[in-house]
Amino acid sequence: MADMLTIAGKTFSSRLFIGTGKFASPEIMRDVLQACKSQMVTVALRRVNLADPEDDIMSQIDTGETNFLPNTSGARNAEEAIRLAELARAGSGTNWVKIEVVPDPRTLLPDPIETLKATEELVKRGFIVLPYMNVDPILALRLQDVGAAAVMPLAAPIGTNLGITNRLQLEMIIEQARVPVVIDAGLGAPSHAALAMELGADAVLVNTAIAVADKPVAMAEAFAMATIAGRAAYLAGLGSQCPVASASSPVSGNITVDLDFLD
């Protein structure tokens, strides 16, 4: 049976989600989506005109193959995020939304209090909410409690390409999760995506590492393969780590060789 990802009753065969913020052109974004076969693409509402079917970005997204996930990038508080989500639903008809509430342009870290407020209110309004969050196991539980369809903890600050910087707390979030965990932001290399999947994450979201690569399409393919490999390793069951050596060959029944002839 195929290993499918399910979020809010919708199934996906690809566990690689793609962000659209930094591509040099909409055409490169389109080629990346086709190459990596991603089925979830997130778009900042402030960058698109949902009322225009010829919009540069939206016209390159095959919504028959790819789930459109609008995000509230630019929102500084819950009120602004809620307003953007409602605009997205009115303009596109989708009730899916990725909540991003980022008040500080220097750190670009999500506001936990406002994110929780926005998530709770939008769930009440019938939205399928995927909140972007810090690596905070308690916040992850609270977001699940108020109805988040998935949680999206960052690997590292957005755009840094640093990879997983807080593995312990990320593992806590994954271990206690009742909804899918999507690692979002800071994944800078395919190996980072593979590690996230090996740890038990349900999916990863990547933008910068692909968009700024010398060959974005080739990098997208590399991330897709890494995501598949990491997931396969997790399902296979990774061996436990040990601080001391353990022989892989038998240590009993050794052959004794007489080297006296060398004298």
Curated annotation (Swiss-Prot):
Q: Which UniProt keywords apply?
A: Cytoplasm, Schiff base, Thiamine biosynthesis, Transferase
**Residues the entry annotates as binding 1-deoxy-D-xylulose 5-phosphate:** G159, A185, G186, N207, T208
Swiss-Prot/TrEMBL GO biological process terms: thiamine diphosphate biosynthetic process
For molecular function, the Gene Ontology terms on record are:
thiazole synthase activity
Recorded GO cellular component terms are: cytoplasm
HAMAP family to which the protein is assigned, alphabetical: ThiG
The free-text function statement in the UniProt record for this protein reads: Catalyzes the rearrangement of 1-deoxy-D-xylulose 5-phosphate (DXP) to produce the thiazole phosphate moiety of thiamine. Sulfur is provided by the thiocarboxylate moiety of the carrier protein ThiS. In vitro, sulfur can be provided by H(2)S.
Q: Which family does it belong to?
A: Belongs to the ThiG family.
Which protein is depicted?
Answer: Thiazole synthase
Originating species: Desulfotalea psychrophila (strain LSv54 / DSM 12343)
